[in-house]
């Protein structure tokens, strides 16, 4: 769980340090070429971004983690490579770049001023500026809403200025918090008078054919030192080890590109898919269940999960849905490769206790999340029927964000069911004074299903249960 008291310490394992690598960390901006686009005073600033990028480069180049079982030792002195780098370079194929380039008109692709403006952005972050401008012009849009996750907001003003100049439109940067693809806020964009919306950094959970306005999803593929990732896996595992590879959408293209060179060394590589997500993609609430092929417990032949990405939130999802599989994380920014652990038994106990307490309640509150598209009216209808059939009284509350202090104001509510983010209950449910159940837990509490021995992570799965978005 996200609380540090419930997570065992990570174990940092063999990490290859390469001080002579072709790193694709965002470079500093070329100061010899000045783009013609006029950057507004609200713009974050090239100098600030360049300084951050330079500091990140220095941190990655100078820090190496040595092999240990319980502690992490770091050194800031330059060291030599401890592997032999292969001559074959790994090709990273961006998502549909070649096809998109063939479709975008030459007057956009070859616009010198536009190309100079795009150089302000990090070269290894694919914001698909050319495609965005082309789509906006195709749609004859006048006002464009731009929605970014927190980690990309620092680039929002640059992108806004570029789009306004080269697409001749007005832009709106939507500053409300965006936790994931479920937070696509097309309703607000429409109410603000936008006729086109660009959502950055997440996959298409909300199909463009059901959104309220014309939409474009930009996944923001991030390229990094892929060769280091490949060599790290080869350095740490035997050729017979079965690898199950997953990532977030930003690194999905790189994950696919790594498959071919890794297959030359490992005999069994598997990239799972939990539809409607892309192959290898996982969400914090949705991950595939891995089918075991080695029930005899032979550790060398068992599957292991390799997660490519920073942070633990998404990784914990596939760990929860596959508690018997070892999980490793490769951070593409720090180049640290670590064995990750999770206290499943404590999580099970906390959530079952909450369900047991809630089962005795007579007055429920149902929270329909209004942050983007988090709340599902279909799930709401299903839970209302369950509550009625169990003779429970309930009140429906609309909330964009859920905090303990806010819910404490509803003193007559004995238990809550939130239809927003399942992980909110799992990770932070203990912080609320009254039980805060997610739809799956409510299903168990109200007798719709028995407690599952493996906690389901299927909230956006096409094969999910009655408590999920795509249930039939």
Swiss-Prot record:
Residues bound to [4Fe-4S] cluster: 182, 285, 421
Keywords: Iron, Iron-sulfur, Metal-binding, S-adenosyl-L-methionine, Transferase
EC number of the protein: 2.5.1.108
Cofactor (UniProt): [4Fe-4S] cluster
UniProt pathway annotation: Protein modification; peptidyl-diphthamide biosynthesis
Disulfide bonds: none
GO molecular function: 2-(3-amino-3-carboxypropyl)histidine synthase activity; 4 iron, 4 sulfur cluster binding; metal ion binding
Domain of life: Eukaryota
InterPro entries: DPH1/DPH2, DPH1/DPH2_1, DPH1/DPH2_2, DPH1/DPH2_3
Ranges in a coiled coil: none
GO cellular component annotations of the record: 2-(3-amino-3-carboxypropyl)histidine synthase complex
GO biological-process terms attached to the record: protein histidyl modification to diphthamide
Note describing how the cofactor binds: Binds 1 [4Fe-4S] cluster per subunit. The cluster is coordinated with 3 cysteines and an exchangeable S-adenosyl-L-methionine.
Pfam families (alphabetical): Diphthamide_syn (PF01866)
Top EC class for this record: transferase
Family: Belongs to the DPH1/DPH2 family. DPH1 subfamily.
Assembly with partners or alone: Component of the 2-(3-amino-3-carboxypropyl)histidine synthase complex composed of dph1, dph2, dph3 and a NADH-dependent reductase.
Role this protein plays: Catalyzes the first step of diphthamide biosynthesis, a post-translational modification of histidine which occurs in elongation factor 2. Dph1 and dph2 transfer a 3-amino-3-carboxypropyl (ACP) group from S-adenosyl-L-methionine (SAM) to a histidine residue, the reaction is assisted by a reduction system comprising dph3 and a NADH-dependent reductase.
NCBIfam families xref list: diphth2_R
Name recorded for this polypeptide: 2-(3-amino-3-carboxypropyl)histidine synthase subunit 1
Source organism of this protein record: Dictyostelium discoideum
